[in-house]
């Protein structure tokens, strides 16, 4: 098994329900034991090993992995999920923007990226990454968001290095619901380490480190 995981996602790829884990090196696959109904380590995927801080999987099976320091990778696995079939490295989302780190998130089922200057999204139909105008027009100041946590289908926490921001989705637009600056806490979060755990009853717990 792969130790030191930085992100874990339950997803379906090629019709198989699995847990994917990425860490500072391999991409690992976990499957559900049919007897115990518990997740167990299956294998490490061949063909990809890198410093990954977060990732998301889109509806078509693309794995979008954010490098710890620069760019993102788009991966597609073979049918047996044991090796990488396609790999594309994307160093920047727009010409002239050399921000380095690109964050990857999922918002209302859509893959969303941020690079500190804009939000972008992946268009399944065209296979292209384009500016996400819905957020850029109303909340350009949130373009340094590094994590999005879903409270429910219409409420989302945007996590920045200075605050937690709650946005609601109403009538086709995002609306500001609440801002919680880190200065309210005795021990401010470590950079890029803030997170939120949402319990089954909808309570949000703020993780500072």
Regions found by a protein language model. Give the residues of each.
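Carboxylate-rich, polar loop motifs that coordinate divalent cations or form catalytic acidic clusters
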Residues: 1-209
């Amino acid at each position: 098994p792969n130790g030191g995981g930085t992100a874990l996602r339950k997803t379906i790829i090629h019709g198989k329900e699995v847990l994917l884990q990425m860490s500072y090196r391999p991409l690992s696959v976990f499957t559900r034991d049919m007897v115990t109904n518990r997740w167990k380590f299956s294998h490490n995927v061949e063909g990809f090993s890198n410093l990954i801080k977060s990732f998301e999987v889109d509806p078509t099976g693309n794995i979008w992995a954010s490098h710890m320091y620069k760019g993102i990778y788009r991966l597609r696995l073979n049918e047996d999920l044991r090796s990488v079939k396609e790999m594309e490295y994307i160093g920047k989302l727009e010409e002239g923007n050399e921000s380095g780190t690109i964050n990857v998130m999922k918002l209302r089922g859509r893959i969303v990226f941020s690079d500190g200057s804009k939000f972008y999204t992946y268009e399944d139909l065209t296979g292209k990454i384009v500016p996400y105008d819905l957020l850029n027009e109303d909340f350009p100041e949130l373009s340094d968001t590094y994590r999005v946590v879903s409270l429910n289908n219409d409420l989302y926490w945007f996590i920045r290095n200075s605050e937690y921001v709650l946005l609601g989705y109403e009538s086709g637009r995002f609306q500001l619901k609440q801002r919680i600056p880190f200065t309210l806490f005795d021990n401010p979060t470590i950079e890029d380490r803030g997170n939120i755990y949402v319990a089954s009853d909808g309570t949000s717990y703020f993780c500072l480190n």
